[in-house]
Amino acid sequence: MPHGQPCGACDGSCRMAQRGTPSTSPLIPSLTPSPPAGDPSPRSSQRIDAVRVPARLPGGSDHPEYGMPLSPRALRPYLARGPGAFCAPPWRPDVNRLAGDVNRLFRGISTSSIHVTEDSRTLRRALLDFYAMGYTHTRPTLECWQSLLQLLPEQSFPLRATLRALNSEDRYEQRFLEPPSDPPNTLFGEECDVSGDESPSEEEEEDEASGESSVSEFSPEEETASSEYDSFSDVGEDDSSCTGKWSSSESESDSESDAPTNNHHPTTRASAAKKRRKRQPPKGERPTKSARR
């Protein structure tokens, strides 16, 4: 029986006035006696507080969020196939279903993404944005829904029907969801803070490249100084053990003072070298065979 008609449980006084019509109907009078003047009925005041403006306006007006009402015949083909077949009225939040769906998305990111941490943050941010829109009463338009979920107008039929059914409810009481009672066995979204899978962004790569190019290279003077430093560091090492000869004339002069004195063998290597210098012929003359030897 239509709402507002008299029946065993309704006396007709709770009927809702149509838009643009007077609050009382002269065709269907009230079946209950009117209360005395100055004695308002507490029952009627409570009923007025519970009245909520329906989301579907009278006459099936076009709603900015989910459009015109859809017939079951037009909706049925899109509930079983296509990208839009992810919801159907009636719809209620299910924390176990939500945990499983989010975990499947994390699995796809962890197995195929090259930026696991960055993409995981993106998914978490998207979930929070949709919650924040509902909490702040920010309702997307139909075109905004289609753009966010990347659906064609025909593919959004199930979504439109589901949104209309949700908004046609009288009221929702605030409640808090507990953690899922049946969580997934493997949580693909769990990762440590230092996972090593974050690749540097383009800005970081440019900074590193500029830092490498700005490193000063050794100049020829610095290389010469470093080579001289290396040669000085090796002076203290005696190379006579490996060559069997004195390394320079300075070492010969040093060895002359350090050479052991022997009365029977006064000739040293230093004196022999001096004798060889005296035997050298003047410039321009060829040395004799004995001098060559």
Swiss-Prot record:
Q: Where is this region: Disordered?
A: 1-49, 175-293
Alphabetized Pfam families for the sequence: Herpes_IE68
Tell me, what is an example of a GO biological process annotation in this record? Answer: regulation of gene expression
Identify the keywords attached in UniProt to this record, alphabetized. Answer: Early protein
Q: Which GO terms describe its cellular component?
A: host cell nucleus
Which InterPro entries does the UniProt record give?
IE68
Amino acid composition bias (Basic and acidic residues), ranges on this chain = 282-293
Q: Where is the composition biased (Basic residues)?
A: 272-281
Q: Which family does it belong to?
A: Belongs to the herpesviridae ICP22 family.
Return the protein name.
Transcriptional regulator ICP22 homolog
Source organism (scientific name)? Equine herpesvirus 1 (strain Kentucky A)
The protein's gene is named IR4
